[in-house]
Every structure is written in C-alpha cells, then in structure tokens.
C-alpha cells in the first residue's frame, strides 16, 4: 500500500460545505465535472499510471463509514494522473463486486482514466462529497460517493501539487 493510499484511508474527512477554502482551491475540490477533462484543459496531455488493481476483502473503518451498505469484496484501483511526468493526482477507487457484475468493463480500463467512463454514464449521481487537508504534507484531497443506477462506488483523489490550484477551472 502506498503512502498516498494510507493518507487517504487515515484522513479526517469533512463535508465539503464545512470547509472554508480559497476559491482557487475549492473550485478544483468541488468540481462536479470530470477532473481528468479539467486537468487536460489546464495542463495539456494527461497520462494514467496504474499503481495497483486488486480485490480487497475488508475496508478500514474510515471507508466503511463513508461507503454505506457495501459488502466486500471491492475492486480497488489506484492510479496516478501525470502531465509531462509531473504527478498531479493520486486516485483510489473502490468498486463493489455488485457494480462490476453490471459493468465488467471497469476492470479493463488499463491506462484510461475512470472519469472517461464515469462521465459517460447518464445515471451517474454524486451522492456525497467530502474534503480533507493533510497538515503534515499540506496536500488536499476529496472523496465522492458516486451512484451508478442503484450501485455505488467511492472515488478518492489526492491533489499532489499546489500548481493545480494556480490554474483556473473552466
């Protein structure tokens, strides 16, 4: 497990409405459109580097509280989004087996961004959005509970460089 993954799993999360952030940061963290698309507009080409993909059978308490009524196993996918070899985002996605039975293509994404698939789903709804700011690293992160039909997935994203927040969200 990477340090980034541990940081996301052990973070103190709060509802997005409870955090007072500068507009330059909140506009990225509260983005309701595709983060990948926004990164491409801000940085040009964005590449996905898959760090790990595997089944997990237990969630830590933090993820269990956020992820209602989801039984493991979950497909866990961890990636880094890069532009010009600069790491921009670490993402950890948890997809329950029940969602994969309907959308097995999620296990075949390879170096494609999840957002390319997710934002093509007409029945996609973001149920929850939580944010965190890690004082030790000064990194910001967000996690969302996304519904696809009657099923949920969790997407957590750690913003790896403050350079992101200097770019205007379009």
UniProtKB/Swiss-Prot annotation:
GO biological process, one term: pyruvate biosynthetic process
Pfam family, one: Chor_lyase
Pathway(s) it belongs to: Cofactor biosynthesis; ubiquinone biosynthesis
GO cellular component, as recorded: cytosol
Record keywords: Cytoplasm, Lyase, Pyruvate, Ubiquinone biosynthesis
Group of enzyme by EC: lyase
The organism's place on the tree of life at top rank: Bacteria
GO molecular function: chorismate lyase activity
Record's catalysed reaction(s): chorismate = 4-hydroxybenzoate + pyruvate
EC number(s) given by UniProt: 4.1.3.40
Residues bound to substrate: 77, 114, 157
Subcellular location: Cytoplasm
Protein family: Belongs to the UbiC family.
Its biological purpose: Removes the pyruvyl group from chorismate, with concomitant aromatization of the ring, to provide 4-hydroxybenzoate (4HB) for the ubiquinone pathway.
Protein name per the record: Probable chorismate pyruvate-lyase
